[in-house]
Amino acid sequence: MNAPLTPIVVQYLYVHEPEEGFYYPTARAGRSAAQVAQRYLECALAQVASLAYREIPCDLILAMNVTDRSVLGRAGTDLLAKIEELGATVLPTPYTHRPKPGTEIYVSSRYVLDAIMTSTEGIDPGRQVWLTDLDCVWADPARVFASAPPAPEIGCVFIDYPPDWDTVGFEAHGRTRNGIGELAAAMGAAGGAPPWVGGELLTGTAGPLRELVAACEELDAQLAAGDKTLPNEEQILSLAGAVGRIHFADLSAVARRITTGPRSHAAHVTGFEQIGLWHLPAEKGLSLRRTAQQVRRGHTRRLRRDLSDPARTAKRFNVGDTGPLRRLRDDGWIAAQRIRSITPRPAGG
């Protein structure tokens, strides 16, 4: 009997060109392309650690467009080296599925389409590929891997936005679930408010994933013929599902976007023990960064202990109850990062 094929976990990071315009709405993002890349490499390292330190049987890939690592600065280069040291392969991936020229918000969001193409090239057609946002933590990898839908379905996370909730904030079309439904109806589909496909997780085997990219390309061409555009990946993925080109399977029972911390007006998180993949966008400058710093410095004893215990894992990443002292520490951490963000840095830092 053949042994099951090892899954592939793919993260992807587009590093902006030095003169490229981009916008991130948070102070923690930094002022330069190198600083933005460093913040996201911290997330990537934390995610790799959440798998590598448990010796989870999977292959780890980080798709990147960088060929000259010096553009990452010293800190970024060190982070990337540590990611490789933990067993991840850096996969050169040019960005060819960009939004229209001039887009500065969500400019990198469609990079997942290129990561699909490079990570699935030449692999066994039966291997399951898991593409995740960088700011994710694998709390229960086995639970997530066991949820893989049968081919040709594509696993994802449906986000339960209200039908008229504007998730994009610019451009004229497809900004809401109803807006995606209107575009789908114009293409001959039933219309209505289709599910919104989140970008934090996509999973499938090579053939269906590559068909997903082809479907997005064809839909982009149809939209462009009518002088319409969808700037981010969640919009075009949702449209692909709405018109019936791709059948998406909702994995929100095992993977979810979790809002953390009072600064994000987060509600108390319940049922996190059943969620195997946590998407933690509010933790970029907090627990994910602290974890990356510990890995980078070799101070991993507590991290390994935390990852071996679900309750400790939840506390580390601010998913479980943390108490007022932890919140006070987080507030101090944020203040320190904001001060640092306006302090001049040495060249190459």
Predicted regions and their residues:
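A structural signal for short, well-ordered beta-strand segments and their strand-loop junctions
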Residues: 9-10, 61-63, 90-92, 128-133, ...
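A short acidic, often aromatic-flanked loop/helix-cap motif at beta-alpha or helix-coil junctions
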Residues: 95-102, 163-164, 255-259
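Catalytic core and acceptor-binding pocket of nucleotide-sugar-dependent glycosyltransferases
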Residues: 182-283
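N-terminal anchoring/stem segment of glycosyltransferases
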Residues: 1-100, 124-125, 314-349
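A short, conserved beta-to-alpha structural element at the edge of catalytic cores
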Residues: 155-183
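Long, low-complexity C-terminal extensions of enzymes
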Residues: 264-349
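A short, glycine-/small-residue-rich helix N-cap motif at loop->alpha-helix starts
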Residues: 103-112
